[in-house]
Amino acid sequence: MANYITIAIIVGIVCGQALSVEDVDRNLLELNLPYGRGLDSELQLARLMLAAPRFCHPKRNSELINSLLGLPKNMHNAGK
């Protein structure tokens, strides 16, 4: 029984740390500020560039359409 309690405590600590990492990213990007506010300064741009790369991988519209339709890139280029 003591082992189950120890495992539950360890899992709780690990989950708590994972959630705090997301909060750090959110505070780093200042995403909790009101909408409509752009990158007003170089400091905000630097914070955006230092953030985790998962926020910085935009896809073009053609890449999104091809991924949804399952078309290979060569087939899309041949149609141009």
Curated annotation (Swiss-Prot):
Name used for this protein in its record: Pigment-dispersing hormone peptides
Tissue-specific expression: Expressed in the brain (at protein level).
Residues carrying Alanine amide: A78
Task of the protein: Neuropeptide PDF is the main transmitter regulating circadian locomotor rhythms.
Chief location category: secreted
Propiece residues: 21-58
Native source species: Camponotus floridanus
An MF annotation (GO) of this entry: hormone activity
Family from the record: Belongs to the arthropod PDH family.
GO cellular component terms attached to this protein's record: extracellular region
UniProt KW keywords: Amidation, Cleavage on pair of basic residues, Neuropeptide, Secreted, Signal
Record localization: Secreted
Signal peptide: 1-20
